[in-house]
């Protein structure tokens, strides 16, 4: 009774602590107590590990050890690795909640079943946690100050069980000005084992979040201000820090599953679920006024050819006067006050309303003792409504909803209306303006697999065939694209994706296992890449087509009571990919819709990971990765004028042999842990990453830009060369102390990342698509603008205390 009362109190405290704030989910899995990782010293250790240990040891070790750099494993972005609950796709932001609810996760790093970067599957049919509870308080200072969380599992009568989780985080970052987080996350899981043997599971989860984020900038700005953690997105308002870039979310999620044994040989898993809510991103907008961003290239010394002016600007930056190096909110209010009620500056809130639902029916039939079939159907609909809202008028009365980029245009200055059906509408706080549209995706797929499994062999063949339909629905009628060109339903793009994969595994003994997986798939591009400008144009790209992916993966696994070892070799090829970008073209001085087609990449390499239990007290983990991640052809760059879809140019981009950004070509980590069962544990680890590159820009390598605008071989090389980032290494340490009090445990953990406090590690970067233009006498000179980079955090400390009972 006392434990239950304490849990209720802690849940209420964590809710009240954050009831007035909304924040983004933050995954603290990397800071789990060392005490929770102590080995099970029994004869069942080997059996337990074979059945229940995650299949991806390399991913388990590297997922958080390399948080100090961009780490797109195998050269694929994180969003290409989906999260599913009983075949229903959910956002990976829910991972923390799902693990705390006791769901069994199976991490698959290979491209089986069409998931090109692997997947994480959560299963509700693998049992429920025993009755227990845990509450924690934690402090970090990295991104936010600290928080509280509580989790409880309880077995009820008549086959019911319930798990609940709630966590709150809040406060300002101790390292980066302007960074903050206020969030609360909650989840509940209900499970019911029926007398017939059927299983019912319902999972509900949500995160309410608001995060003040940092932004990368050029090395020039970092050097001038003398701080690699400089953040240009905030400024002082009435003596308080205010960030112009905030990210918010409120996206509740629900998944319901029903498992039934239809016959002696056939079982059914039926699932339905979805996510409904919204995400927001704020930014400053300016309308017939100068940019408010302090790190804009026109406000830095390097922009000026007059050395006297450049020196004056440099001195202002080196003094770190926040009126110049940060957003000057007071100046924005002053300019608005002199505009007669019309906003020259406003805080915009870009909003996406998510409405996505899925349904899945999966069958498994045992044809014989060693042969089984899996087959099923999956249907999904995703209707994402996207619009812009006036967040704050900064002292102005209203904002006239017109296209301010066209005010001085010789051709279109009389066609300014963003919403022709409500011309010259005066938008006030909370009103939609600029654009309003919905992208609707409908998917239907059938799949089947056959598995042959004996004591040593496991062979599977899988195939899926689907239908993918996408259309745009415009809710504003743009004046430059009147009637059906922007308003109402566009044409529907129909594609037919498919996947073919096969895998084979052989077990030599309970310790040794090898496997080989190959997959070929054609997949639909992201919906936003199928339109020239989905914000206000119903025009689709020319010849929309499927992307092709081919993957092969060979792996070896060794498992015993003393060690777990995995080694794998992989190859992943992508062809016929498409990317669409809306940007300003400096050569034509025109806003353009830029379509990059026929993108091809190749990733191949090896991964090695091991966990060796040297004794009952000592344990080591090791990971090594080496690979090559490159673009393999020169894609086509097509520029359309954003005002009337006129073709401006088409040329090839010199991308062949460029490296994929965000992934180290060589990486390694090693950690040693000491565990004393009297209540102490400590660990020390080192992480190294080398051969890293900034993400290359397609447009600046186009023949039109790199060859035609370059006045010398030196400038041409500047356009097509790719910056290699410096090698990075960190030393991490942690210390834990726990106390067993009856049937409960109190634990304390102190973790330190980047123990040596290195402040010059570049987290990652990307090339700017913009071009710098200046004159040298009568000659026009074009050069690429500086790369945008972000630096890693210095020494960071995480402390947590938890009570499990």
State where each predicted segment sits.
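C-terminal beta-signal and adjacent terminal beta-strands/loops
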Residues: 22, 688-706, 737-805
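Gram-negative outer-membrane beta-barrel transporters
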Residues: 571-573, 592-699, 800-804
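Surface-exposed extracellular loop regions of Gram-negative outer-membrane beta-barrel proteins
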Residues: 217, 416-417, 421-426, 469-480, ...
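Outer-membrane beta-barrel signature, preferentially recognizing the C-terminal barrel domain
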Residues: 230-253, 257, 435, 439, ...
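A beta-strand signature from Gram-negative outer-membrane beta-barrel systems
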Residues: 92-138, 147
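Transmembrane beta-barrel wall of Gram-negative outer-membrane proteins
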Residues: 141-170, 175-214, 246-263, 501
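Signature of Gram-negative outer-membrane beta-barrel scaffolds
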Residues: 346, 374-509, 534
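Acidic/polar loop-and-plug regions of large Gram-negative outer-membrane beta-barrel proteins
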Residues: 199-257, 280-348, 412-427
């Amino acid at each position: 009774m006392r434990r239950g009362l304490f849990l209720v109190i802690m849940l209420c405290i964590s809710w009240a602590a954050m009831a007035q704030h909304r924040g983004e989910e933050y995954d603290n899995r990397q800071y789990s107590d060392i005490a929770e990782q102590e080995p099970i010293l029994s004869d069942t250790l080997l059996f337990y590990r074979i059945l229940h240990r995650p299949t991806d040891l390399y991913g388990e070790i590297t997922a958080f050890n390399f948080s100090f750099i961009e780490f797109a494993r195998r050269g694929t972005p994180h969003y290409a690795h989906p999260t599913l609950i009983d075949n229903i796709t959910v956002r990976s932001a829910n991972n923390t909640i799902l693990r705390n609810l006791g769901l069994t996760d199976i991490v698959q790093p290979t491209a089986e079943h069409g998931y090109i970067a692997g997947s994480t599957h959560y299963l509700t049919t693998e049992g429920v946690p025993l009755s227990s509870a845990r509450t924690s308080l934690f402090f970090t200072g990295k991104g936010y100050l600290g928080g509280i969380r509580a989790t409880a599992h309880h077995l009820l009568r008549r086959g019911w069980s319930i798990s609940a989780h709630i966590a709150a985080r809040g406060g300002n970052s101790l390292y980066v000005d302007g960074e903050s987080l206020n969030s609360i996350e909650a989840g509940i899981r209900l499970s019911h084992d029926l007398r017939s043997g059927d299983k019912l599971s319902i999972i509900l989860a949500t995160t309410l979040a608001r995060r003040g984020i940092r932004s990368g900038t050029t090395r020039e700005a970092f050097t001038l201000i003398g701080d690699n953690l400089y953040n240009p997105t905030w400024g002082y308002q009435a003596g308080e820090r205010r960030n112009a870039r905030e990210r918010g979310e409120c996206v509740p999620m629900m998944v319901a599953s029903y498992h039934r044994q239809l016959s002696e040989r056939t079982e059914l898993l039926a699932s339905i679920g979805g996510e409904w809510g919204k995400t927001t991103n704020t930014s400053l907008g300016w309308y017939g006024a100068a940019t408010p961003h302090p790190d804009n290239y026109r406000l830095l010394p390097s922009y000026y050819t007059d050395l006297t002016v450049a020196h004056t600007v440099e001195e202002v930056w080196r003094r770190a006067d926040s009126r110049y190096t940060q957003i000057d909110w007071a100046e924005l209010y002053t300019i608005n006050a002199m505009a007669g009620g019309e906003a020259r500056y406003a805080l915009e809130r870009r909003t996406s309303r998510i409405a996505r639902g899925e349904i899945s029916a999966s069958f498994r039939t045992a044809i014989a003792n060693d042969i089984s079939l899996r087959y099923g159907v999956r249907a999904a609909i995703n209707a994402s409504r996207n619009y812009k809202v006036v967040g704050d008028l900064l002292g102005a009365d209203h904002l006239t909803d017109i296209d301010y980029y066209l005010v001085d245009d010789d051709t279109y200055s009389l066609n300014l209306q963003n919403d022709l059906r409500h011309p010259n509408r005066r938008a006030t706080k909370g009103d939609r303006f600029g654009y309003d549209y919905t992208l609707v995706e409908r998917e239907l797929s059938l799949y089947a697999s056959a598995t042959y499994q004996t004591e040593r062999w496991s062979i599977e063949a899988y195939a899926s065939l689907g239908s993918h339909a996408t259309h745009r629905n415009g809710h504003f009628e743009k004046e430059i694209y009147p009637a059906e060109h922007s308003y109402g339903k566009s044409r529907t793009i129909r594609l037919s994706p498919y996947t073919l994969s096969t895998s084979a595994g052989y077990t030599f003994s309970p310790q040794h296992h090898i496997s080989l997986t190959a997959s070929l798939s054609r997949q639909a591009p992201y919906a936003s890449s199928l339109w020239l400008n989905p914000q206000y144009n119903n025009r689709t790209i020319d010849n929309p087509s499927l992307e092709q992916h081919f993957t092969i993966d060979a792996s070896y696994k060794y498992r015993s009571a003393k060690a777990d070892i995995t080694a794998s070799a992989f190859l992943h090829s992508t062809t016929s990919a498409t990317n669409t970008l809306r940007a300003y073209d400096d050569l034509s001085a025109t806003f353009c819709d830029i379509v990059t087609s026929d993108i091809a990449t190749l990733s191949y390499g090896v991964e090695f990971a091991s966990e060796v239990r040297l004794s009952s007290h000592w344990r080591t983990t090791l990971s090594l990765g080496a690979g090559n991640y490159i673009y393999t052809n020169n894609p086509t760059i097509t520029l359309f004028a954003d005002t009337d879809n006129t073709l401006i140019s088409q040329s090839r981009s010199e991308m062949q042999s460029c490296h994929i950004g965000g992934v180290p070509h060589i990486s390694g980590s090693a950690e040693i842990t000491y565990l004393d069962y009297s209540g102490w544990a400590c660990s020390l680890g080192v992480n190294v990453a080398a051969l890293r590159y900034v993400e290359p820009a397609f447009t600046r390598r186009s023949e039109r830009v790199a060859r035609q605008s370059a006045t010398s071989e030196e400038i041409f090389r500047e356009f097509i060369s790719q910056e290699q980032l410096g090698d990075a290494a960190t030393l991490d340490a942690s210390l834990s102390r726990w106390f067993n009090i009856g049937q409960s445990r109190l634990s304390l953990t102190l973790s330190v990342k980047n123990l040596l406090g290195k402040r010059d590690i570049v987290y990652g970067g990307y090339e700017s698509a913009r071009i710098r233009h200046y004159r040298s006498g009568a000659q026009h000179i074009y050069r690429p603008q500086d790369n945008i980079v972000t630096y890693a955090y210095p020494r960071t400390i995480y402390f947590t205390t938890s009570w499990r009972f």
